[in-house]
């Protein structure tokens, strides 16, 4: 269902910002069910069935044209933090802990975390989090750049909505262009990235938002 919902959100121009949060207050997402993992391993189908599906969904979250905010309102482990990495911003409750515990069952973050985490916090911090598999505090997560903001647990969702409302007031075409541009130029040589950005802004200048803004 989430897979289909993401397709709908992508096509809906009336949706200007997306906030992801957990149901209830105990967890944003505690990751995969270890018993379920054991069954997949026994069948030899873990990669083809579970991780491919999960990676596809996470890629869709990352590729959403709208700005995205993860409101980490409870414990966030494994696949949960991998999902949060796909968002543009992460707001975390001060009592929440996050971690990548996969090493404890002879695995590693297989739903994109191995790729996305080093790009966000650097190789050394990523290795530390994945090697030791320890849960870290919200303050530590913010210190290393894993999350963008820490606030009291009971304010996480309201703060995320506040940020979303601020973004929703801005020109949506410009926000989409900035998001797409940053993602696309990340791996380009500087000069190629500059040329790309010139083309992007030329297209942006032809939009209704730009005509009204200028």
Give a label for each model feature.
Residues 1-42, 60-70, 89, 93-97:
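A structural preference for short, pocket-lining loop segments at secondary-structure junctions
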